[in-house]
Amino acid sequence: MLSLTVYTEINTLLFPQVVTTNADSDTLFYRPKRSGTGATIPGIRSKLFGLLDLSLEYRSVKGSYVPQFFDQSYDLNRVISASQGNETSIKTKDMAIFEGYDNDWTSSGVYGSASMNLFDLVKFNASYASMTADTIEYNSFNAVINVNTDNIPKLSVANAFYRRNNDKDPFDFDNPSENTIMGYRVGYEMSKGVSLIWEYSEFYRDNGSGELEPVKQTKVET
C-alpha cells in the first residue's frame, strides 16, 4: 500500500549581536547580528507497504539560515577554535558557517530521506541535502541505525550514527571536517525504568597547528 502527504514548513534563526571588550575598551570578541529564514515548498512524504518511509523536499533559504543547525552534534561544535601561526581565533558555529555572507544571501536545493523498519527488529534512517548559493554548494548527510531492544533482555537502547552537515563533500570519509561526528549508544537496564547508558562519540578539532585531529569522547550516564 502507498500513502502520500504533501506539506510545507517555514523556520527562522535569530543570532543577537555580541560584543566583548576589555578594560581598555579593546574588542576581544565580536559576533554580528544575523537572521535567516528557511522554507520547504513543497515537501512530499510517502510510506510504502508499512516498511519504507520516503520524503523529498525543495528548500529555499534567505539570510543566515541552514537546516539542521541545532542538530545532535550542536553541543560539540557550537564553539570552534582555529589556529594560524601563533594566533588562535574563537568562533561560534554561526560565525564559522555564515562568515562572508550577509542577510541578503540566498540558496536553494533539495532534501531527501529514507527510513526502513525491518520487521520491527532494526530501523535504519538516512538523509541527504544539497544546497547551492551562487557557485557555492554545501551538503549534508546523516545516517542512524536503531536496534529494537524490546525483545533483548537487559538491553534498553542500542544505536549508531554518522553525521556531517553543511559541508562541501559529506561523503569524503577519508578527510573528515569539524562538522563530522560519529558514534554509538548502548544502554544496560539495571532495573525497571533505570538504565546505565554508555555513549561513545568521535569528532574533529584543530590541534593548535591548523590541522584536524580526532577527539574521542566517552560518557556514562543513567
Segments from the language model and where they lie:
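Residues that define the transmembrane beta-barrel architecture of outer-membrane proteins
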Residues: 35-40, 50, 104-110, 137-143, ...
